């Protein structure tokens, strides 16, 4: 309750200071209105009907500057003794003195269109009953109202006395607008942080934070005032602060607003969500997070071990070394997987050795095949000559059966002939073992090999002779009689 009373007393004091400052501003504005001089002609008259809405862009810009200046004055009163003690913070009087030396508020000397609405007039005393933005509109008979309510002839005279170069001064607008824009942004942040507490002012103010910007205030002040960015001939009438965006333009006001709104939060402080937790709660959250990570890791390990169990053959996994059936667990699965991988590695090594041996054998056989292909003409000639001799001998045996001994002698002669040309054949084949043997015992070895080679033909000839002539060389007719009787 004491806090509410103190807040109300402070608010009352601020309102009194605001009233006093408003009176000072009223007197200063009245002094700024100059009377027309006769040495100017009508060439400098600017008709409001030449622009949409009946107001020139210069009028619109000056109205915005005037509103920002007024908000800056209110902000200086609401900031308290701390803002007044700072020598670098401009007050309302110093703001106006700087603005008066540069501009004379063109909206005091220009008339609005016939259909334009007059400015809403609200008393400062209605700040506790109406919305805050309406209380910050004109709290007195402003020079704009006076200019709209004066006779037409006087307004024409005032407009005629304005120099042409004075209407288009932009450097003065930059300084004034940047200064007032900073103050208006500080006003909105200070009201949000200091005055507008929900306990004491929720019933007195219908505060809307978005209504304190220049665009929203200008829309409240006069519905037909357009923003300077969309006005007619914007390149000629707008200041460089609107065209180029200086340091203190509304786009960069977030620095001052954030510094005022977050004055209680230091650069190294934690957020409010974590700042309200105790040490036990922080430790508990850390432990829960660690447990969740550990649980996820164990689940992944279990899943991969299960996949390994599907790769190992069941005969190796489900039976122990003694052949007894067992139920595999994680340790058994890992052990049998290692054994199975070692077994596969050994198989690969054995297969590599066998493959190497087979490739060497294939190479050796290919070399032998090429050497045999080179000796094929000699072997063909040998078989052709031996075939002719055999055919002649067989014809002689068939024609003259009594010439069997001669046939045997012919066969022996053919063997001798074969013995004469056979050694070069063995030398061309390249059998080194046989070649060395033939050099030491040429006749003996070759005779034995030829005897083995021709033994089949000799045995066949002897069987035929026994069949035809009998064992004791008797008459063939007797042999046939014995064969028939048998």
From Swiss-Prot:
This is Retrograde regulation protein 3. The 9aaTAD motifs are transactivation domains present in a large number of yeast and animal transcription factors. Residues 285-344 form the bHLH domain. The gene is RTG3. The modification Phosphoserine is found at residues 81, 123, 142, 227, 236, 241, 269. GO terms for cellular component: cytoplasm; nucleus; transcription regulator complex. It is found in: Nucleus. A motif (9aaTAD 2) lies at residues 189-197. The modification Phosphothreonine is found at residue 150. Its main location: nucleus. The keyword Repeat applies. One of its GO terms (biological process) is regulation of transcription by RNA polymerase II. Transcription factor that regulates CIT2 gene expression. Binds to two identical sites oriented as inverted repeats 28 bp apart in a regulatory upstream activation sequence element (UASR) in the CIT2 promoter. The core binding site is 5'-GGTCAC-3'. The keyword ATP-binding does not apply. Keywords: DNA-binding, Nucleus, Phosphoprotein, Repeat, Transcription, Transcription regulation. Residues 75-94, 101-130, 246-263 have a biased composition (Polar residues). Present with 1050 molecules/cell in log phase SD medium. A motif (9aaTAD 1) lies at residues 27-35. CDD domains: bHLHzip_USF_MITF.
